[in-house]
């Protein structure tokens, strides 16, 4: 006999293929695990549309994952993926007691999820996580959502959605961090500047390299580290060589999440040069690691200690120089929000 426990289905473009796949969407991984921990009696099922690149059903930390294996293919293949997702949801509706659907990002998952939920009178929320709030997101035209169906990752994302689409998300639920992942350490802060993220044009790591070149004039032995992979890797390495800082910057490539956190705890400053960011989980993680944070993005209206928001490259360089010259930098952890509280806020939308 099939379980009739309350079931929440999470729809996501991707999800880790196994427990070792910690580099795949770390904030979403942490969130789903937290949901399981605070609601042990709740049955959670994750339906992954595109990644992993294979079709399977498997267990991930006690959570059932159903991978469709869409593999990012477009046109007719994407339609086939949507049909498969719909059929899986129909099966789950028959077998389980669904309390609702939660879609990560306002994209194809939200499209399928919203239509299915309306047809079967289920609660459905779309969690806008950043890029989906920008202009020219076709899914807003297709879905025509109401504000009470939308959850914004940050105050910034909520404003972007209202500005670009004339609808204001009624809920703002930001990134949370799992403080248990941060080990007590007395490690020396031997990394001057750390960066972590996808090496794509939007993240602007060319500005990171130019900042290191600027700082090298005052700190010839400056030690910088960049974690992440992407199509910009080779061009960034060439830029570092051209700027004379190839010996000052270590390109780590893709690094497991727990190792990134360890590097943060060894860093004096975390530099996040991204030109657009819904929130940036790395900002929360770096702050809790005790690093000073410099970024162009300001996700929440509230001010947080150790987070310096700059508007120009010149202002960024000046702030970095000031921080590195300060021999009495405060490296106390700053907590924006715990993942437990975020999970409680989310599940309260589905259950009383």
PLM feature spans:
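N-terminal subdomain of nucleotide-sugar transferases
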Residues: 1-53, 351
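Conserved donor-binding/catalytic core segment of Leloir-type glycosyltransferases
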Residues: 9-11, 186-203, 207-212, 225
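Short alpha-helical donor nucleotide-sugar binding micro-motif in glycosyltransferases
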Residues: 254-255, 262-267
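A conserved, positively charged/aromatic
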Residues: 124-151
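Nucleotide-activated donor-binding/catalytic signature segment of Leloir-type glycosyltransferases, i.e.
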Residues: 237-255
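A charged, aromatic-enriched C-terminal amphipathic alpha-helix characteristic of glycosyltransferases
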Residues: 325-352
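Aromatic "clamp/platform" in nucleotide-sugar-dependent glycosyltransferases that forms part
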Residues: 275
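Carbohydrate-associated surface elements
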Residues: 156, 176
């Amino acid at each position: 006999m099939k379980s009739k426990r309350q079931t929440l289905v999470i729809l996501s473009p991707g999800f880790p293929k196994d427990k070792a796949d910690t580099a795949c969407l770390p904030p979403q991984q942490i969130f789903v695990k937290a949901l399981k921990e605070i609601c042990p009696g709740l049955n959670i099922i994750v339906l992954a549309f595109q990644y992993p690149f294979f079709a399977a059903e498997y267990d991930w930390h006690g959570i059932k994952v159903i991978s469709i294996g869409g593999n990012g293919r477009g046109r007719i293949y994407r339609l086939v993926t949507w049909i498969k997702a719909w059929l899986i949801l129909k099966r789950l509706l028959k077998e389980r007691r669904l309390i609702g659907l939660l879609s990560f990002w306002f994209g194809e998952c939200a499209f399928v999820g919203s239509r299915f939920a309306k047809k079967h009178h289920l609660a459905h929320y779309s969690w806008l996580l950043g890029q989906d709030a920008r202009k020219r997101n076709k899914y807003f035209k297709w879905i025509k959502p109401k504000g009470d169906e939308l959850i914004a990752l940050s105050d910034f994302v909520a404003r972007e959605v209202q500005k670009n689409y004339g609808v204001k998300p009624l809920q703002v639920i930001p990134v949370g961090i799992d403080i248990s992942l941060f080990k007590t350490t007395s490690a020396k802060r031997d990394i001057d500047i750390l960066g972590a993220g996808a090496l794509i044009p939007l993240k602007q790591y060319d500005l990171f390299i130019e900042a290191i070149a600027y700082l090298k004039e005052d700190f010839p032995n400056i030690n910088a580290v960049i974690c992440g992979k992407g199509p910009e890797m080779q061009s960034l390495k060439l830029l570092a060589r051209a700027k004379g800082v190839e010996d000052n910057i270590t390109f780590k490539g893709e690094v497991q999440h727990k190792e990134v956190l360890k590097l943060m705890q060894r860093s004096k400053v975390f530099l996040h040069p991204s030109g657009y960011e819904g929130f940036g989980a790395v900002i929360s993680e770096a702050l809790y690691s005790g690093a000073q944070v410099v970024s162009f993005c300001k996700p929440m209206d509230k001010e947080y200690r150790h987070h310096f928001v700059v508007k120009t490259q010149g202002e960024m360089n000046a702030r970095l120089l000031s921080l590195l010259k300060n021999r009495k930098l405060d490296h106390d952890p700053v907590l924006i929000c715990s993942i437990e509280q975020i999970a409680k806020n989310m599940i309260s939308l589905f259950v009383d």
